[in-house]
């Protein structure tokens, strides 16, 4: 309802539920669903699309990270096989599919944290390639920001705790 009212009123700053201000949740999910409503019209399908795209982005990012981290001496078929298997397992896991089909902020939080941690992994393990390391740092910062916009400070706290625990 909040994204629909954002689209109808044109006010993308103040979330409203039945005409009343509604600041119970951060705005990222509202913005993504509202943008989808503007592009595809107001429908259940358009409401679910942003979460599905977020889930899909993590699957492809995991695939790409596994290819980037594969040893150079390993055969291409082994690299592709491992990356495909891991990304496929994530893509077909019931929890990932279930949250990816629903229009709730939990998938935006999970995707933001996952992409941030994948960015950290890229920056940490690819020190030999400066551009990949920089890309990892940018991804870490960008997707921590997305996670904060999706669910609040927990979007920064969880990746931070994981990284501190790892280091």
List each model region and its residues.
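Membrane-integral, polyisoprenol-dependent glycosyltransferases
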Residues: 1-167
